[in-house]
Amino acid sequence: LSNLEQQVVALAGVAQAARIVDQVSKTGTYPLEFLEPSIHSLFEFDTDSVADVFGGLAGAKLGLQNLSAMLANRQGEESRDVVRYVFNILYLERKFAADTEMISVVRSRLEHASFNAEHFAGHVDDVCHSISGIYQDTLSGLKFRIKVNGSAQHLNDSRNADIIRALLL
């Protein structure tokens, strides 16, 4: 993939995470076939291409579709939160990238969590809980916060909160 294509896939990964955050916050459900590659991407430290981070382009398909719809302005009013999450995640990433100490802590903790995530299938909740703790201990301490909109019933569910924090990381 060209450099531009790599950037598109990376942005699609952000769009995919944002889309799943929106779905979990509003319905309490998620597409496992896209949640798994999104979460697994956190454990890919040394890959040759961005697509490999998602286990291939198929792992970022939902994000590619959402990114295409965003750019073509084919999304309705209900997708406004997804667009906001994308911009907020990118803004938070810039703040995170400026903090080398936090980067080191997050990487170290993700490397430790990846050992526990080797048998990811069937353990989504445990892995997301572990990653959620990393998010709470690091990025949630930054001044900028991402406000997630949705149903109180789904947002107050600790399992959903863990999935949302893991995706935001």
Where do the protein language model's features map onto the residues?
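Leu/Val/Ala/Ile-rich N-terminal alpha-helices, chiefly Sec-type signal peptides and the beginnings
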Residues: 1-62, 66-70
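Short amphipathic alpha-helical segments and their helix-coil junctions
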Residues: 1, 62-75, 141-157
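Charged, amphipathic alpha-helical oligomerization/scaffolding segments
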Residues: 9, 13-20, 84, 88, ...
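Charged/polar positions within long, soluble alpha-helices
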Residues: 19, 23-26, 94, 98-101, ...
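Alpha-helical oligomerization segments
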Residues: 159-169
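Helix-start/N-cap signature of alpha-helical segments
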Residues: 3-10, 78, 82, 164
